[in-house]
């Protein structure tokens, strides 16, 4: 009996061994986190991919001007780092070679994957800087950065560069960072390029240093600038402070409260980008001087700030930028939808066409999708300025020249209350420029000439508006009855002593 039992155990062992020997060998598996990796243009730049395998693997390299490590691995995930050994001095991306990954060794090789290795030009085709000074909008700034990160992919910004400068730690410091695509994770990463131990947003020298660093860290053939902050148009910082200390609450018709302070919102108003960070503002003329002194030129400026589509402001900035995108009224604190905006800024179209799409995306978001973010309203007005048309740098009579002749001609009076305004103050400061000229000009020929030149300076296709605009100064939506996309303070009954010092007034007033 015992011998029989032993024989049965032996038979079971033999059968089990036979069954195991018939099990299939696992199918070799080898995956890469990317099929292509693009190294930065400088020597020493690095990129990484993640290798996932169910067994041992090794690689072979064809090409030159890059190193790779490690050259083999085992089961699991392995991060492989590639390093450029030469600078790409060409104007376009170049192919350095390929890396072939194989599981197993020799004749036992199984799965195979190929990685293409490229290198961007050392001088990028395009660098975009998002500058967000101040801290009162910090949570919204962080949301804006997250929006950019969602937009970044293997194709966006491509060979371009995206830099961000803001003040996450305090009013006296700043951080210059880059948002780029990470081939190892398939997502975006944020890399700190420089920390500023001493940085004051109101100091021209701080801005000059930061702008110089942008060209140092991310040299490019073209530069674009987005400024996201509180905006006060042409109003000098001292004028705003003086008025804020001296004005009080007024009333709307019907007795509702309305602020008349520069720049004090009503209690419980929804947040916009028109106030905050008092004491850290920079006058627009000082900002323009910094820009004009740079050894390179920004092709465009996008203001993610309130009131900056203002003729007095745009005229101050005309020499520093070819195009300026801005809003004549308040911008909700959420700002631009960067996840939708950034891809257009790095498309293959010309600058004007790209910015026209940016205007549309901004308007479409606030017209149709404004409820997708909290503390928001259906309030989005935008326009695009072609600065060469303001002063005639395009070879035609400038808008300034036409306006000066129009202001010198006979004008009719009208009820100021019928003029489109762009804030909810009890005593208005910003009025619609096109509406003002239409109501006051009696010379039909001059008016036609103005409108023709105005349309060249502010193309109609990019003058977009929602039916109303929200103002934190009266805490409500205000209807838009006439929209030209740009404001003026010419008819305003406040701050005249400062207004007369603006370059626009001096160029157009004939008193």
Where are these regions (language model features)?
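Bacterial Sec-dependent N-terminal signal peptides
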Residues: 2, 13-38, 67, 106-122
